[in-house]
UniProtKB/Swiss-Prot annotation:
Matching CDD domains: AAA
Annotated positions binding DNA: R311, R316
EC id: 3.6.4.-
NCBIfam families in alphabetical order: PRK00080.1, ruvB
One annotated GO molecular function: ATP hydrolysis activity
Protein name, as recorded: Holliday junction branch migration complex subunit RuvB
Gene name tied to this protein: ruvB
Biological role: The RuvA-RuvB-RuvC complex processes Holliday junction (HJ) DNA during genetic recombination and DNA repair, while the RuvA-RuvB complex plays an important role in the rescue of blocked DNA replication forks via replication fork reversal (RFR). RuvA specifically binds to HJ cruciform DNA, conferring on it an open structure. The RuvB hexamer acts as an ATP-dependent pump, pulling dsDNA into and through the RuvAB complex. RuvB forms 2 homohexamers on either side of HJ DNA bound by 1 or 2 RuvA tetramers; 4 subunits per hexamer contact DNA at a time.
Length: 333
């Protein structure tokens, strides 16, 4: 699968860039107002009681700021944050080493927490509930279990697939917050903030053009801004205009709704070869040369979200909205 300009997943070279533009406080964090206001209250209450904040689960689509929020939680609490991920914790001993190194009140951030294996998860239960872990020392008949007390800490888990979390793990989170897609106004503000950090001048209309194509996702917005800035810089533009932004985005093959060439290929393929559907997933896969899992998990969600595609018992169907976007007539069936 090729790397896409409009993918919400973090790309290899983006970690350092994202670190440099990441907000560090709730005041700097744009959007997610309900989540933000609730977290402010929970954090303030925990500080007033001099207790560790309840464990927090942040879930929702990729690229919406779950890692950033976890950093802000630690900053607002005035504690250190230890970062890891579900796939990185392979054995119970790995988790035990992380937990025993925590200081009182610290935040442990586990990204992709749905990918923890079951044995590791079982070590996490008493750690979350009672701030202790049981470890086995020795082997065979001489093996014995030793209980280690842990300092009070806050686990912040992040996942794009909350449904894959086991019930025992999910039930141990005192705070659960779903992050939603951003609107154009919020994304415009984010783009303007990032442009200021990059020392890049751009017109308000240019920010709006980039925001419209960002699929409601800050990560995509910031990526598109960086690429538009490249085009402007090489062209000698001191200030990014709306026309420069539009021209650059067209060269990147990102249309006014954030659809790229793969989206066009998929939708137009169903329109022209199958009269708009219904058509089966396997057939689409053969037509565009992509795996069925990739189509279902990567390409289709946004097309479903904007109402361009429907899943029916008989297969995929392109909607009249999609025909309108591509200036094509809806076929008579």
């Amino acid at each position: 699968m090729e790397e896409r300009m409009v993918s919400a997943e973090a790309q290899t070279e983006e970690a350092a860039v994202e670190q440099g533009i990441r907000p560090h406080s709730f005041e700097q964090y744009i959007g997610q107002e309900k989540v933000k206001q609730n977290l402010k209250v929970f954090i303030e209450a925990a500080k007033m009681r001099e207790e560790a904040l309840d464990h927090v689960l942040l879930y929702g689509p990729p690229g919406l700021g779950k890692t950033t929020l976890s950093t802000i939680i630690a900053n607002e609490l005035g504690v250190q944050m230890r970062t890891t991920s579900g796939p990185a914790i392979e054995r119970p001993g790995d988790l035990a080493a992380i937990l025993t190194a925590l200081e009182p009140g610290d935040v442990l951030f586990i990204d992709e927490i749905h990918r923890l294996n079951r044995m590791v998860e079982e070590v996490l239960y008493p750690a979350m509930e009672d701030y202790c872990i049981d470890i086995v020392i020795g082997k065979g008949p001489t093996a014995r279990s030793v209980r280690l007390d842990l300092p009070p800490f806050t686990l912040v888990g992040a996942t794009t697939r909350a449904g894959m979390l086991s019930s025992p793990l999910r039930d141990r989170f005192g705070v659960m917050a779903r992050l939603e897609y951003y609107n154009v106004e919020e994304l415009t503000t984010i783009i303007e903030r990032t442009a200021t950090i990059f020392d890049t001048e751009l017109e308000r209309d240019a920010s709006i053009e980039i925001a419209r194509r960002s699929r409601g996702t800050p990560r995509i917005a910031n990526r598109l801004l960086r690429r538009v800035r490249d085009f402007a810089q090489v062209s000698g533009d001191m200030r990014i205009s709306s026309s420069r932004a539009i021209e650059s985005l067209e060269r990147l093959q990102v249309d006014r709704l954030g659809l790229d060439h793969i989206d066009h290929k998929l939708i137009k393929g169903i329109m022209t070869k199958f009269n708009g559907g219904p058509v089966g997933l396997e057939t689409i896969s053969a037509t565009i040369g992509e795996e069925t899992d990739t189509i279902e998990e990567v390409y289709e969600p946004y097309l479903l979200q904007i109402g361009f595609l429907q899943r029916t018992p008989r297969g995929r169907v392109v909607t009249p909205l999609a025909y309108e976007h591509f200036n094509m007539e809806v076929p008579n069936k």
